[in-house]
Amino acid sequence: MITAIAKKIFGTRNDKEIKKYFKRVALINALEGKYSNLSDDELKSEFSKLKVDLLSKKVTKDDILNDVFAIVREVSKRTLNMRHFDVQLIGGMVLNDGRIAEMKTGEGKTLVATLPVVLNAMDEKGVHVVTVNDYLAKRDATQMSEIYNFLGLSVGVILSGEYDDEKRKIAYNSDITYGTNNEFGFDYLRDNMKFEVGQKVQREHNFVIVDEVDSILIDEARTPLIISGPTNRTLDGYIQADVVAKQLVRGEAADPRVPNSKATGDFVVDEKNRTIMITEAGIAKAEKLFGVDNLYNLENAILSHHLDQALKAHNLFEKDVHYVVRDSQVIIVDEFTGRLSEGRRFSEGLHQALEAKEGVKIQEESQTLADITFQNYFRMYSRLSGMTGTAQTEATEFSQIYKLEVISIPTNVPIKRVDRDDLIYKTENEKFKAVIEEIKRSNIKGQPVLVGTASIEKSEIFHKMLVKEKIAHSVLNAKNHEKEAEIIAQAGAKGAVTIATNMAGRGVDIRIDDEVRELGGLYIIGTERHESRRIDNQLRGRAGRQGDPGLSRFYLSLEDSLLRIFGSDKIKAIMDRLGIEEGESIESRLVTRAVENAQKKVESLHFESRKHILEYDDVANEQRKTVYKYRDELLNPDYDLKDKIISNRQDFVKTLLDEVNIFDGGLGDEFDISRLCEVVYGESGTKIDEDEIKGLDYHSLADKVIDKLAKDYDEKMSVIDDEQRKNIEKVLYLQVLDGAWREHLYQMDILKTGIGLRGYNQKDPLTEYKKESYNLFMELVNRLKNESIKTLQIVRFKTEDDENTDRALEKMQDEANLQNKFEKKPARNEPCPCGSGKKYKDCCGKSGPKKGVFA
């Protein structure tokens, strides 16, 4: 209460910041006359002078900001016939300061970005503009390139599916690069799997503007980017677990209010935390069905894991809500955008469990080769900024995790949209009927309606109901997302009815004409509250752009997921007190507040989850940075591994001595020299004469073995020149490093999966994870030292004579195989084994095998 009064008297921090920016806007406006009087060539010349001054460090970016913004505004007027409003200049300054600009729908965020983009591209270190999809990346780059090209700046676009390294390199070397968050992240991971510096496509991470920043840095923060490879593990367990899961019966959790109450059934589902707990009865039943004595024995660990995932697949994941089945494949539906996430798969065997559930071909389990979260990728940039229409609800998270401040930019024209209170019905069916009646009422007078649904399944239900009512409409969901921009752009036409899942065409404007304005503008109907208030605000924000009229309202029921899981007891009590009959609804601020409190509960759960993921990923991130930094050193053409190999060889020999129980301080006569010679030969291919090293003390023995390995190695390397030696050492070392890092990531995945159980032992799982992961990393370092020396010692070079011999042997083998083919006489109608493509009877079968042809 006191805080609210203080804000009214003194103004908020946001208000103070906006006032500061408005003072600078006046200075930029004062320059408008100066630049509008210049010819095109004079304007370009002025910009070039500023760029030269900046590159020669005579001025800073802040010194020239006013002039650059004024020039960009003038160029935009001349090329695009669009003039930046004052509030757009403020948005540009907020982005330039490394903050988040919250700008409502239709305020021209794409044009705002051109201001800081041009200013930060002037130092030639590159600027990245990140969008949520390929369509927006291509559209924004194409539209705004007229401004950039006028000023002599180059523009590149990174699109998914176009993996030509040379083209990508050109795009990244442009002054300005547009692309999606996934492509930027994956290119970073791919670059750190390359074997030459010249093969890398990205350059330094300088300045980035993230469009729809809330979607990318918050909604997708729980989804790491993973490059994976096959594990070659058997897939039978998934089918077996699926059969067992179908026979287990779902029960109810124990009631904490009733003493000694127990969970019923074979397993209990906790929808709030999206987890499943198998009861004692369920464990006994599963053991019987699997035919094992103890499901939780070490040898059955994979079985119990498969069963957990199968139960999740059947009880927590719904077809057409969380995933769709298309072309015999299970494809994830992004819960925030409603789009299909093709190419993305659930990890830890969950995707395979869904494939078993749906009876489609189970694809091989994958192993992580490289991974990173968006949180850690975007924190690599020297300066990170973002823009969106909805960020204030997550301002705390932006501040805590990304050190980003959210500044709300005033609208150019006041918002005229009317947001009505929610209507709540007892059942989902009543709600559906009420929505259809409301659509009919609006449709009769011609007011366009956009209906937002939470899933593909619900959008299909509305589609069928509207078909029954003979109301013409368009459907936009993940199944027909190809026409997204086209469908959304038409949603503001008179009489239009559009059903859309959460995707609702972000970045595409819904324009309305004067006739629709007279009818009250676009009517937004939300059919379910999302877990995040921000997603609801985005749906509302589709109407009322640039001062247009509009209307929005949410229709809810007590059977909606959010209210059922998180908040319906209080609301149900209110409805019972008011004696609400079937088909009736309630509309009150009290209920709307209760719904918002339920959403806040979920948001804080998700925030904790993202924070938790980041805390764990920060541990892995430090290790990732260390490995990638070392990898970059290896790729440096001037880096010589000679000293590193000498040092690693010493550690390698110490490891071999430890293996055969030869320790410092032991008596030379008691050392098992025969075993040592055997191990050295097995691990390095180097033969040592026992008599040469018998009776030596520990240090003399170690030196002798090291010298022998070094002599062998130098002798082998003497057949090639120094440059070739360096290249071979680097390539082999990189291969060993990548293999060791892959194995390390696999071990880290296993560690992360089970670490939560340490909490039952009164230990902090995060502290335990840090300790264990440090130990794993030290194992990685030791493995790298030993494996690299082992590989370098064992490798052998072929002379030209060896190559010729191999080729001759190969040829003889092929001829022998062919002879064998002919000895097993084929049937007359079978294809002829000579490879002609004809039947045997029409070819070699005519007059016996024509051996002369193959001599």
From Swiss-Prot:
Record keyword Nucleotide-binding present: yes
GO biological process, one term: protein transport by the Sec complex
Cofactor, free-text remark: May bind 1 zinc ion per subunit.
Record region (Disordered): 815-837
Keywords, ordered alphabetically: ATP-binding, Cell inner membrane, Cell membrane, Cytoplasm, Membrane, Metal-binding, Nucleotide-binding, Protein transport, Translocase, Translocation, Transport, Zinc
GO molecular function: ATP binding; metal ion binding; protein-exporting ATPase activity
Family membership noted in the UniProt record: Belongs to the SecA family.
Subunit record text: Monomer and homodimer. Part of the essential Sec protein translocation apparatus which comprises SecA, SecYEG and auxiliary proteins SecDF-YajC and YidC.
Designated name of the protein: Protein translocase subunit SecA
